[in-house]
Amino acid sequence: FSIREADVHLAAGLPLTWIRNQREAFRSYLLQNPEVHYRFNGKEYHLHFAGCSLYPQGYPAIVNHLGNFKGTNLLADIGNGTMNILYINNKKAQESRCWTEKLGVNQCMIAAKNAVLDKFGVKIEESTVEQILRFGTADISAPYLDCISSIARQYVAELFSTLRKYEYNPDLMRLYVVGGGGCLIRNFGTYDKSRVTIIDDICATAKGYESLAYMSLKRRG
Protein backbone atom coordinates (compact mmCIF):
# COMPACT_ATOMS: atom_id res chain seq x y z
CA PHE A 1 0.00 0.00 0.00
CA SER A 2 1.28 3.47 -0.86
CA ILE A 3 -0.21 6.94 -1.13
CA ARG A 4 0.04 8.15 -4.72
CA GLU A 5 -2.04 11.32 -4.45
CA ALA A 6 -2.38 13.73 -1.53
CA ASP A 7 -2.95 17.28 -0.34
CA VAL A 8 0.33 18.59 1.08
CA HIS A 9 0.92 21.45 3.48
CA LEU A 10 4.51 22.65 3.17
CA ALA A 11 6.57 23.64 6.22
CA ALA A 12 9.93 25.29 5.60
CA GLY A 13 12.39 27.80 7.01
CA LEU A 14 14.23 31.00 6.20
CA PRO A 15 17.35 32.49 7.82
CA LEU A 16 16.44 34.38 10.97
CA THR A 17 17.26 37.80 9.56
CA TRP A 18 15.22 37.19 6.38
CA ILE A 19 12.01 35.86 7.87
CA ARG A 20 10.27 39.20 8.38
CA ASN A 21 10.95 40.77 5.00
CA GLN A 22 10.94 37.71 2.75
CA ARG A 23 8.33 35.41 4.31
CA GLU A 24 5.48 36.23 1.91
CA ALA A 25 7.66 36.34 -1.20
CA PHE A 26 9.11 32.93 -0.35
CA ARG A 27 5.66 31.53 0.40
CA SER A 28 4.46 32.70 -3.03
CA TYR A 29 7.53 31.12 -4.63
CA LEU A 30 6.89 27.75 -2.97
CA LEU A 31 3.21 27.81 -3.92
CA GLN A 32 3.66 29.08 -7.48
CA ASN A 33 2.62 25.66 -8.81
CA PRO A 34 -0.63 24.56 -7.11
CA GLU A 35 0.03 20.92 -8.00
CA VAL A 36 2.77 18.69 -9.35
CA HIS A 37 2.87 15.38 -11.17
CA TYR A 38 6.04 13.31 -11.10
CA ARG A 39 7.32 9.78 -11.52
CA PHE A 40 9.47 8.03 -8.89
CA ASN A 41 10.69 4.44 -9.15
CA GLY A 42 8.34 3.85 -12.03
CA LYS A 43 5.24 5.07 -10.20
CA GLU A 44 3.19 8.21 -10.86
CA TYR A 45 2.49 10.66 -8.03
CA HIS A 46 0.19 13.67 -7.83
CA LEU A 47 0.48 16.32 -5.10
CA HIS A 48 -1.83 19.27 -4.40
CA PHE A 49 -0.23 22.06 -2.33
CA ALA A 50 -2.80 23.14 0.25
CA GLY A 51 -0.73 25.76 2.05
CA CYS A 52 2.66 26.74 3.42
CA SER A 53 4.01 27.61 6.88
CA LEU A 54 7.37 29.35 7.26
CA TYR A 55 9.54 29.55 10.37
CA PRO A 56 12.94 30.94 11.37
CA GLN A 57 15.68 28.43 10.61
CA GLY A 58 17.10 26.74 13.69
CA TYR A 59 14.19 27.46 16.01
CA PRO A 60 12.11 24.42 14.93
CA ALA A 61 14.97 22.12 15.95
CA ILE A 62 14.48 23.02 19.62
CA VAL A 63 10.67 23.05 19.69
CA ASN A 64 10.55 19.64 21.35
CA HIS A 65 13.02 20.87 24.01
CA LEU A 66 11.10 24.03 24.96
CA GLY A 67 9.71 22.32 28.05
CA ASN A 68 13.23 22.50 29.51
CA PHE A 69 13.71 26.20 28.74
CA LYS A 70 13.68 28.62 31.65
CA GLY A 71 14.67 32.26 31.61
CA THR A 72 17.16 33.27 28.93
CA ASN A 73 18.51 30.79 26.40
CA LEU A 74 20.64 31.25 23.30
CA LEU A 75 20.26 29.20 20.13
CA ALA A 76 23.16 28.81 17.69
CA ASP A 77 22.30 27.13 14.39
CA ILE A 78 25.66 26.38 12.79
CA GLY A 79 25.19 25.33 9.19
CA ASN A 80 27.53 24.93 6.25
CA GLY A 81 27.74 28.61 5.34
CA THR A 82 26.39 30.61 8.26
CA MET A 83 25.70 30.65 11.98
CA ASN A 84 22.25 31.91 12.96
CA ILE A 85 21.93 33.25 16.50
CA LEU A 86 18.61 33.68 18.32
CA TYR A 87 17.70 34.59 21.89
CA ILE A 88 14.78 32.72 23.45
CA ASN A 89 13.32 34.26 26.60
CA ASN A 90 10.77 32.32 28.64
CA LYS A 91 10.28 29.90 25.72
CA LYS A 92 9.53 32.72 23.24
CA ALA A 93 11.80 33.50 20.29
CA GLN A 94 13.01 37.10 20.33
CA GLU A 95 12.91 38.04 16.64
CA SER A 96 14.43 41.43 17.43
CA ARG A 97 17.49 39.67 18.87
CA CYS A 98 18.63 37.49 16.01
CA TRP A 99 21.71 37.69 13.82
CA THR A 100 23.40 35.82 11.00
CA GLU A 101 27.18 35.46 10.80
CA LYS A 102 29.15 34.02 7.87
CA LEU A 103 30.87 31.51 10.09
CA GLY A 104 29.65 28.16 8.88
CA VAL A 105 31.41 24.80 8.92
CA ASN A 106 32.64 25.26 5.35
CA GLN A 107 34.90 28.08 6.51
CA CYS A 108 36.60 25.63 8.86
CA MET A 109 36.87 23.06 6.08
CA ILE A 110 38.57 25.55 3.75
CA ALA A 111 40.93 26.76 6.48
CA ALA A 112 41.93 23.18 7.36
CA LYS A 113 42.66 22.22 3.74
CA ASN A 114 44.69 25.40 3.24
CA ALA A 115 46.64 24.79 6.44
CA VAL A 116 47.66 21.30 5.28
CA LEU A 117 48.66 22.64 1.87
CA ASP A 118 50.70 25.47 3.39
CA LYS A 119 52.44 23.32 5.99
CA PHE A 120 53.03 20.07 4.10
CA GLY A 121 52.69 21.06 0.45
CA VAL A 122 50.03 18.42 -0.25
CA LYS A 123 46.30 18.46 -0.92
CA ILE A 124 44.13 16.51 1.48
CA GLU A 125 40.81 14.90 0.60
CA GLU A 126 37.79 16.84 1.81
CA SER A 127 36.25 13.58 3.04
CA THR A 128 39.25 13.07 5.36
CA VAL A 129 38.89 16.55 6.83
CA GLU A 130 35.15 15.99 7.23
CA GLN A 131 35.76 12.79 9.17
CA ILE A 132 38.09 14.61 11.56
CA LEU A 133 35.61 17.44 12.07
CA ARG A 134 32.73 15.02 12.67
CA PHE A 135 34.48 12.43 14.83
CA GLY A 136 37.63 14.14 16.11
CA THR A 137 40.04 11.74 14.41
CA ALA A 138 40.89 9.88 11.20
CA ASP A 139 43.37 7.26 10.03
CA ILE A 140 46.15 9.68 9.10
CA SER A 141 49.55 10.41 10.62
CA ALA A 142 49.77 12.52 13.76
CA PRO A 143 51.29 15.69 12.20
CA TYR A 144 48.40 16.00 9.74
CA LEU A 145 45.82 15.24 12.41
CA ASP A 146 47.37 17.79 14.76
CA CYS A 147 47.37 20.44 12.03
CA ILE A 148 43.69 20.00 11.22
CA SER A 149 42.70 19.69 14.88
CA SER A 150 44.47 22.97 15.62
CA ILE A 151 42.45 24.74 12.92
CA ALA A 152 39.24 23.20 14.25
CA ARG A 153 40.01 24.42 17.78
CA GLN A 154 40.64 27.92 16.42
CA TYR A 155 37.35 27.82 14.54
CA VAL A 156 35.39 26.75 17.62
CA ALA A 157 37.10 29.45 19.67
CA GLU A 158 35.97 31.97 17.04
CA LEU A 159 32.42 30.63 17.30
CA PHE A 160 32.33 31.28 21.04
CA SER A 161 34.00 34.67 20.57
CA THR A 162 31.26 35.61 18.11
CA LEU A 163 28.56 34.47 20.54
CA ARG A 164 30.13 36.60 23.27
CA LYS A 165 29.93 39.56 20.88
CA TYR A 166 26.17 39.12 21.12
CA GLU A 167 26.31 39.04 24.94
CA TYR A 168 26.48 35.28 25.42
CA ASN A 169 27.38 34.54 29.03
CA PRO A 170 27.37 30.85 30.04
CA ASP A 171 26.81 31.79 33.69
CA LEU A 172 23.58 33.63 32.88
CA MET A 173 22.04 31.54 30.08
CA ARG A 174 22.08 28.13 28.49
CA LEU A 175 23.31 27.55 24.97
CA TYR A 176 21.60 25.21 22.53
CA VAL A 177 23.52 24.22 19.39
CA VAL A 178 21.91 22.74 16.29
CA GLY A 179 23.28 22.08 12.82
CA GLY A 180 26.47 20.48 11.59
CA GLY A 181 28.70 22.70 13.71
CA GLY A 182 27.62 20.96 16.89
CA CYS A 183 30.05 18.09 16.37
CA LEU A 184 32.96 20.53 16.10
CA ILE A 185 32.06 22.11 19.41
CA ARG A 186 31.82 18.67 21.01
CA ASN A 187 35.14 17.46 19.55
CA PHE A 188 37.24 20.61 19.75
CA GLY A 189 35.57 23.05 22.12
CA THR A 190 36.20 23.97 25.74
CA TYR A 191 32.88 24.58 27.45
CA ASP A 192 30.72 23.68 30.43
CA LYS A 193 28.81 20.60 29.27
CA SER A 194 26.15 21.19 31.91
CA ARG A 195 25.33 24.58 30.34
CA VAL A 196 25.56 23.68 26.64
CA THR A 197 23.21 21.29 24.85
CA ILE A 198 24.22 19.96 21.44
CA ILE A 199 21.30 18.53 19.49
CA ASP A 200 22.68 15.78 17.26
CA ASP A 201 19.49 14.63 15.59
CA ILE A 202 19.93 15.54 11.92
CA CYS A 203 16.14 15.33 11.51
CA ALA A 204 15.43 17.69 14.44
CA THR A 205 14.65 20.68 12.22
CA ALA A 206 12.34 18.69 9.93
CA LYS A 207 10.53 17.24 12.96
CA GLY A 208 10.19 20.75 14.36
CA TYR A 209 8.72 22.13 11.14
CA GLU A 210 6.19 19.30 11.17
CA SER A 211 5.25 19.86 14.82
CA LEU A 212 4.84 23.62 14.45
CA ALA A 213 2.79 23.32 11.27
CA TYR A 214 0.60 20.61 12.79
CA MET A 215 -0.10 22.71 15.89
CA SER A 216 -0.88 25.75 13.74
CA LEU A 217 -3.28 23.83 11.51
CA LYS A 218 -4.93 22.21 14.53
CA ARG A 219 -5.60 25.62 16.09
CA ARG A 220 -7.28 26.74 12.87
CA GLY A 221 -9.51 23.68 13.01
Please report, for each region that a protein language model flagged, where it lies by residue.
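Phosphate-handling catalytic cores of nucleic-acid transaction enzymes
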Residues: 76
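Short beta-strand scaffold segments in enzyme catalytic cores
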Residues: 83-87
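Acidic, metal/cofactor-coordinating or nucleic-acid-engaging core segments within structured domains
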Residues: 113-119
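Short, basic interhelical loop/turn and adjoining N-cap
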Residues: 120-124
